[in-house]
């Protein structure tokens, strides 16, 4: 049970970090292209 919980939490953290990184990258590209 504990292993599954840690795995699920790890996946959630990774997905969140990936989402933030993608969003940040898109914003930088959009702002850089606009300027």
UniProtKB/Swiss-Prot annotation:
Where is this gene product found?
Cellular thylakoid membrane
Top-rank taxon, per record = Bacteria
Q: Which sequence ranges are marked TM in the entry?
A: 9-27
SUPFAM superfamilies from the UniProt entry: PetM subunit of the cytochrome b6f complex (SSF103441)
The terms describing its cellular component in GO are:
cytochrome b6f complex; plasma membrane-derived thylakoid membrane
Q: Which Pfam family, giving just one, matches this sequence? A: PetM
**Gene Ontology molecular function:** electron transfer activity
Any single biological process term in GO? photosynthesis
Q: Which UniProt keywords apply?
A: Electron transport, Membrane, Photosynthesis, Thylakoid, Transmembrane, Transmembrane helix, Transport
**Membrane-topology annotation of the record:** Single-pass membrane protein
Membership in a protein family:
Belongs to the PetM family.
How does it associate, per the subunit comment?
The 4 large subunits of the cytochrome b6-f complex are cytochrome b6, subunit IV (17 kDa polypeptide, PetD), cytochrome f and the Rieske protein, while the 4 small subunits are PetG, PetL, PetM and PetN. The complex functions as a dimer.
Per its database record, what is this protein's job?
Component of the cytochrome b6-f complex, which mediates electron transfer between photosystem II (PSII) and photosystem I (PSI), cyclic electron flow around PSI, and state transitions.
Q: Which HAMAP family does its entry note?
A: Cytb6_f_PetM
Query: In its UniProt entry, what is this protein called?
Result: Cytochrome b6-f complex subunit 7
- The organism named in the record is Synechococcus sp. (strain JA-2-3B'a(2-13))
